[in-house]
């Protein structure tokens, strides 16, 4: 966003429950977090965020949710959010749907591509939502609602440094999975192999989102 010279502010809702006025915003990006959308008693800000998202969608604001952010948008649209059949941590092959191949955010993506994931929950496709990226066994990897609301289960925003930071901070993920279907070594190999193309596509995706009017 700095490269695009797009003015922005970053809010950490765990530290502050201050929400900006929607009239002051042109685009909204909801990032991930370690909490789940249904843990509202433990994280009370999630209730207020749900109302914020609903109003943003009703007013046609351009909104992009990533991982937890996608699940929050799905929930705001009355779709069910629940445990995925498997935890996806690391690099996974995804595919564009017919809708996805025509979508402005993904028009420069190949039909199949590798993406970085870190999630244990998934969501049903909202009513009137369009699935634009899919995979197996977690089919709802990205959706669009209307013209301006997007939810992405994968992480186009990550950096190599952030991947290493997550593996350090959430080390227990690699100890509790029985049997393990991912490892730090596999993730590092995937990052080495995929990073140049993936980081470029991530920049394109965010740039395309910021270009929505």
List PLM regions with ranges:
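Glycine-rich, phosphate-binding/catalytic loops in enzymes
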Residues: 1-3, 44-48, 81-82, 133-134, ...
